[in-house]
């Protein structure tokens, strides 16, 4: 395994200090309302977010960032695609923490940007295949949502791992498609997930930031 790939694995690890564990992407609201109540419903909810929501849009943005597209323009797109204030906060706060940590580790100048753009700028010099980077990013995103479900549904640890494993084929498909997708393909249709993010903003009792 190359040092470049190991660097990417480190950056996308749950141990990397982006604070990802504190964000549920609206999943906390869906769980509290009973929309997500077991492993099967958690898998469906996360799959929809991956295929039709932030998973796909972030993957396309990341692909273009890896290829050197204007980071300011991509950052503006990422902000515009955030369907709720908490979603914007999620991508900006994680992106800023990610960029600051990678900059401290590498000595590179990496300004704070939305997470997929920050990751793309950081990972571009690694020279890894675009679809491979996208797949690892999507896997980290899905794993974080599964972790939230394990803690809050709650699911058993084995159920959580089975849920994540069941998403692997979908993650590979989205990564392959998004690696070649133009920016014109950007868009979201994960309506229930977007509504959950909006409703979480006024949820009175919560343990997640989003």
Curated annotation (Swiss-Prot):
PANTHER family, per database record: UREASE ACCESSORY PROTEIN F
Similarity comment: family membership: Belongs to the UreF family.
Domain of life: Bacteria
GO cellular component: cytoplasm
Quaternary structure and interacting proteins, as annotated: UreD, UreF and UreG form a complex that acts as a GTP-hydrolysis-dependent molecular chaperone, activating the urease apoprotein by helping to assemble the nickel containing metallocenter of UreC. The UreE protein probably delivers the nickel.
Record organism: Cereibacter sphaeroides (strain ATCC 17029 / ATH 2.4.9)
HAMAP family linked to this entry: UreF
InterPro entries attached to this UniProt entry: UreF, UreF_sf
Keyword list, A-Z: Chaperone, Cytoplasm, Nickel insertion
UniProt main location, coarse: cytoplasm
Protein name: Urease accessory protein UreF
A Pfam family matched in the record: UreF
Protein role: Required for maturation of urease via the functional incorporation of the urease nickel metallocenter.
Subcellular location, record wording: Cytoplasm
Molecular function in Gene Ontology: nickel cation binding
């Amino acid at each position: 395994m190359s040092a470049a790939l190991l660097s990417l694995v480190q950056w996308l690890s749950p141990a990397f200090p982006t604070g990802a564990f504190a964000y549920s992407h609206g999943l906390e609201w869906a769980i509290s309302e009973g929309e997500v109540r077991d492993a099967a419903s958690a898998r469906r909810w996360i799959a929809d977010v991956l295929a039709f929501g932030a998973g796909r849009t972030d993957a396309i943005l990341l692909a273009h960032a890896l290829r050197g597209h204007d980071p300011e323009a991509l950052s503006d797109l990422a902000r515009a695609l955030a369907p709720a204030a908490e979603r914007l906060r999620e991508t900006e706060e994680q992106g800023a923490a990610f960029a600051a940590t990678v900059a401290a580790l590498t000595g590179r100048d990496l300004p704070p940007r939305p997470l997929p753009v920050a990751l793309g700028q950081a990972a571009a010099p690694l020279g890894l295949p675009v679809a491979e980077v996208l797949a690892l990013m999507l896997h980290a995103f899905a794993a974080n949502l599964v972790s939230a479900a394990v803690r809050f549904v709650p699911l058993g640890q084995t159920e959580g791992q089975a849920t994540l494993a069941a998403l692997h084929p979908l993650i590979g498909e989205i990564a392959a498609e998004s690696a070649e997708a133009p920016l014109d393909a950007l868009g979201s249709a994960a309506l229930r997930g977007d509504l959950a993010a909006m409703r979480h903003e006024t949820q009175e009792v919560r343990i997640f930031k989003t």
